[in-house]
Amino acid sequence: FGKKRVFDTPASESALTAMGAGMALAGLRPLLIHQRFDFMIYSLDQIVNWISLWSYKSAGKSQIPITIRTVVGKGWGQGPQHSKTLHSWFAHLPGLSVVYPSSPYEAKGLMLSSIFANYPTIFFESRSLHSMNEYVPEEPYFLDPTKAFVRKKGRHLSIIGFGPSVTNALEVSSKLEKLKKISCEIIDL
C-alpha cells in the first residue's frame, strides 16, 4: 500500500487511537493495530467516550468506521500484565462491534467484514490463531459478525463458545463421543 497508507506511529496508544478516529471521520477506513491489548487500555477515553458513541452524538449523521485489532492471550514470555482478554468490557458499549474469531478462516472473513462495516469494531485476535493451520482462500470473502456458526452438529449436548474456546470445545466433544458416546453440537459465536 505504500508509506501514505501504512506507517508506524509513536508509542502513544491514546494519540494513535484518536488519530485513527480522525482518519475515519475524514472518510478513510483505518485498521489500527494495538499489538498488546494491555496497552490499548490507555485509549479507553477515545474508544468509550468518542468512537463508540459518535453515531449517537451526531444523531446518526456521521460514523467512525474504524477497525481496532488487538492481540490477546497466552504466548511467549507473557506475564500477568500481558495476558488479559477483557473483551466483555467492550461488548457492553453501545455502538461498538466486538469480534473474536476462532480460526484463521474466520479471522480473514471477519476482518474484511470489519474493515468495510460502517461502524467501529474491536477485533480481538488470539495468539493461538498464529500457530493454527487451516485452508484460507486467497480471494476476498466476508463473514457476518452477527451470525453464529455451527461448527459441529450433535444430538445430546450444545457447547457454545468463541475465540480459542471453540478449539477446546471441539477437542472435548471428540473425547466425549469416543468415551461416552455423547454427541455434541458446537456453536461458535
Per-region residue spans from a language model:
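Glycine-/acidic-rich phosphate or pyrophosphate-binding loops and their flanking alpha/beta elements
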Residues: G109-P120, L129-L179
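Residues at the starts of beta-strands that form the adenosine-phosphate
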Residues: P65, H156, S183
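Short helix-loop-beta junction
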Residues: F1-K3, W89-H92, N168-I187
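Thiamine diphosphate
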Residues: F1-L129, E134
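Short, conserved beta-strand edge motifs with alternating hydrophobic and charged residues
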Residues: F124, I160-G161, E185-L189
